[in-house]
């Protein structure tokens, strides 16, 4: 049975969803990391400050009004304040995905001052032991929770992101209740996709469950009157479920047309998952050698090699490696 049957992305109806992995360096080495990020990698970013600033300068003319920065751990990129400053000056909205570990009160206040639109903090369990095991760090849970609280205190919009593992599956209600108790207004749940380190840890990838989306939608409606807004993007068969207010997965492939991805080495692709599956095939160019404007001229040729609908996506045949 295929691991992925529907697109995981919820791209905007117009414009692009730009996801930029600004570094592969990370203070953690999570068992399910799709980028194989690690503290053993070099801390100096592969994309220089000059190249990064040049890229951001191009975005308004391309009609790209926001971007999501991830990693690795984006808060550990030394020049991040300069990137945020330029983005703010140009009116490019910034969303940030982080493990929460580096967030102190001072850093949370700096993120608010920089105008970051939302910080998504990863929390994979309401149980410290389980989260720390996945994140491979005995302090990961406490630091993530501290990061959540500091962002909330500073007035930074916060979302919690959780990866549904087989262990978390029977405890989803307790998990959502815990996050709600922290005062978090938004929660998004996903399943691990078998690329990167997750491909070598198949026990973290649950079997497709047609009833999971319905269960999550039940939780979503339970909290609709008060509590966190719950969303999910499972990448597995969601059984046609599409809770009110949740943008449906695209029926047609959005790679390169409404989705753009930039890897930590500067490679540009139309879809992060396709790129991680086969970088050579899906690489459009590299921002250290070409402008994004020039790179995007290659999208039509890439699109010609892909099926029009998501049913024929190359990712549908990806399976987790067996031990």
Per-region residue spans from a language model:
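Short, well-ordered alpha-helical microsegments
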Residues: 77, 104-105, 169-172, 269-270
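Radical SAM enzyme [4Fe-4S]-AdoMet core and its adjacent flexible, acidic
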Residues: 42, 113-114, 122-124, 129-255, ...
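Flexible mid-to-C-terminal extensions adjoining Fe-S/redox cofactors in radical SAM and related proteins
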Residues: 1-14, 248-250, 267-323
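Generic short beta-strand
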Residues: 92, 259-260
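Conserved alpha-helical substructure of the radical SAM core
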Residues: 1-114, 118
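Cys/His-rich metal-chelating microdomains
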Residues: 25, 29, 36, 256, ...
């Amino acid at each position: 049975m295929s691991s992925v049957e529907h697109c995981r992305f919820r791209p905007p109806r117009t414009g692009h969803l730009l996801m930029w992995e600004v570094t592969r360096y990370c203070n953690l080495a999570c068992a399910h990391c799709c980028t194989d990020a690690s503290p053993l990698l070099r801390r100096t970013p592969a994309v220089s400050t000059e190249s990064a600033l040049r890229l951001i300068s191009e975005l308004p003319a391309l009609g790209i009004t926001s971007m999501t920065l991830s990693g690795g751990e984006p808060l550990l990129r030394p020049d991040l304040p300069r990137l945020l400053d330029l983005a703010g000056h140009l009116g490019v909205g910034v969303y940030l995905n982080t493990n929460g570990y580096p967030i102190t009160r001072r850093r949370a206040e700096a993120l608010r001052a920089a105008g970051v639109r939302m910080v998504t903090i990863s929390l994979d369990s309401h149980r410290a032991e389980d989260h720390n095991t996945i994140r491979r760090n005995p302090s990961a849970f406490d630091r993530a929770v501290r990061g959540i609280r500091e962002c909330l205190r500073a007035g930074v919009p916060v979302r919690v992101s959780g990866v549904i593992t087989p262990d978390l599956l029977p405890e989803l209600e307790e998990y959502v209740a815990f996050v709600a108790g922290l005062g978090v207004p938004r929660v998004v749940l996903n399943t691990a996709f078998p690329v990167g380190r997750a491909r070598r840890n198949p026990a973290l990838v649950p079997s497709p469950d047609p009833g999971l989306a319905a269960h999550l939608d039940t939780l979503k409606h339970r909290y609709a009157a008060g509590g966190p807004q719950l969303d999910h993007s499972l990448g597995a068969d969601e059984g046609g479920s599409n809770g009110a207010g949740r943008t449906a997965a695209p029926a047609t492939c959005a790679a390169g047309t409404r989705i753009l991805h930039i890897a930590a080495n500067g490679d540009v692709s139309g879809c992060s998952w396709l790129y991680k599956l086969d970088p050579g095939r899906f690489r459009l160019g590299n921002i250290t050698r070409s402008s994004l404007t020039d790179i995007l001229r290659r999208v039509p040729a890439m699109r010609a090699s892909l099926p029009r609908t998501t049913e024929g996506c190359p990712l549908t045949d990806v399976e987790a490696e067996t031990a």
